[in-house]
Regions:
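Metal-dependent nuclease catalytic cores that hydrolyze phosphodiester bonds in DNA/RNA
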Residues: 1-133, 145-146
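Metal-dependent nuclease catalytic regions and adjoining charged, substrate-binding loops involved
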Residues: 7-12, 16, 163-257
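General helical structural elements
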Residues: 31, 63, 141, 159, ...
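A broadly tuned, weak detector of single residues within folded domains
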Residues: 50, 116, 153, 230-231
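Structured loops at beta-to-helix junctions and adjacent beta-edge loops in soluble globular domains
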Residues: 53, 64-66, 137, 180, ...
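A residue-level signal for conserved active-site and pocket-lining positions in enzyme catalytic cores
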Residues: 57, 160, 238
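Mg2+/Mn2+-dependent nuclease catalytic core
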Residues: 106-214
Length: 257
């Protein structure tokens, strides 16, 4: 066999291997999307209620109470991989909490019917004979060393303190953000004391959504759109894009509604 034929056969084999490897890679990356295809739980998500004024949209939240969201299609696989890595870090801490016997509840999803609010606290821990909310966050080492606190995590813990108090009827006034440095595994504890003033804007949002929900039930009138059209940057990543603009899969009612 000539050297040219050998080279061609070798190249063909390498091409086939490359194609096969690409097919396997695509199939594995599809797993990140498939893992989210069943995430259609009913209710408002705490993270959406805590969004900034620029990102928060009443129309999106009211739609989410009646129609299915298309979130799996909106998040890029790269972002889903980051989420998966974060989940692995959370599991590390959950296992440690369980081994130490300080776990009261780990990732228990709760529902406030009054507000259609679904929320999941990372961990409720028994520390020094007191129930404390813990929210686990990861940071790159640069941010970890530069920041003293964790503003988004602190806001989240404060909201959970309010929500858990509403749910149980038992005051919960203390929590902390557990910040885990991605690169060197250093940790930081950011204490959070409940602030009624800080949580009020988000409680007001929940109340307003309930008013808008009843308006939609009675008149079928939705809040105004935040986005000018379905191709804006915000709309392209919106969980309720299809239902809002009645495109794609359109408005598919939730099974619970």
């Amino acid at each position: 066999m000539s050297n040219m034929k050998k080279d061609l056969l070798q190249q063909t084999s390498e091409d086939q291997n490359a194609i096969w490897a690409t097919m396997v890679k695509n199939r594995l990356e599809r797993l990140f999307l498939e893992s989210r295809e069943h995430e259609n739980r009913y209710g408002l998500h705490a993270s959406a209620i805590l969004a900034s004024d620029n990102d928060f949209c009443y129309r999106e939240q009211v739609l989410s109470l009646f129609y299915k969201m298309n979130q799996g299609e909106q998040l890029p696989i790269k972002q889903l991989k980051i989420f998966a890595q974060g989940n692995a870090m959370h599991e590390k801490w959950y296992n440690l909490f369980r081994q130490a016997g300080i776990d009261v509840a780990i990732e228990r999803s709760l529902f406030l019917t009054q507000y259609d609010l679904s929320f999941t606290i990372d961990a409720l821990l028994n520390i020094f004979n007191e129930e404390i909310i813990c929210d686990v966050k990861s940071q790159n080492t640069f941010a970890f060393r530069k920041q003293k606190g964790h503003p988004s995590g602190e806001k989240q813990v404060n909201f959970y303190l309010w929500a858990l108090t509403k749910y149980t009827g038992i005051p919960h006034k203390k929590g902390f953000v557990l910040v885990d440095s991605k690169d060197d595994q250093e940790i930081k504890v950011v204490p959070v004391k409940y602030s009624k003033k800080a949580v009020e804007p988000y409680v007001d949002r929940l109340k307003e959504i309930q008013i808008m929900k009843q308006t939609f039930i009675k008149t079928h009138e939705m809040p105004k759109r935040k986005c000018a059209n379905c191709d804006t940057k915000r709309a392209s990543t919106c969980n309720m894009r299809d239902a809002c603009f009645n495109i794609g899969m359109g408005r598919r009612k939730l099974d619970d509604v």
